[in-house]
């Protein structure tokens, strides 16, 4: 019963924050639990969900290339802009942080609870976007490594 209550609270928070991704995710989980598929679906999502999500995000990022909106001409033009270089370096940094985040979440799953809470707070209070857990885990991973060096 506790998972249903917790998910319902998250649904209410998602509705108050008008966060469609959180609402859809919670409704999906409530339906899976309600129709008795949780023993099959949830372990799979727990194991492969982040990779599936990363794959979907990667597909979305590559769509402009597939549609022809971004081609070699746009690529060549973009390297002439300082903002493009800043964006490229930011993309590299975020990808490396996310890599550390995936490793941390796999190694230390209880960190997920704190990351999810932080993401929910950011989404509901500050109109943030719910991609935080992966990047948050990456930032936590880097900070934990720094703490390890000094302790």
Swiss-Prot record:
The keyword Cell membrane applies. It comes from the Bacteria. Keywords: Cell membrane, Membrane, Transmembrane, Transmembrane helix. GO terms for cellular component: plasma membrane. Pfam families: DUF441 (PF04284). It is a multi-pass membrane protein. The chain crosses the membrane at residues 4-24, 52-72, 85-105, 115-135. The keyword Amino-acid biosynthesis does not apply. It is found in: Cell membrane. PANTHER family: UPF0756 MEMBRANE PROTEIN YEAL (PTHR38452:SF1). Belongs to the UPF0756 family. This is UPF0756 membrane protein Aflv_0503.
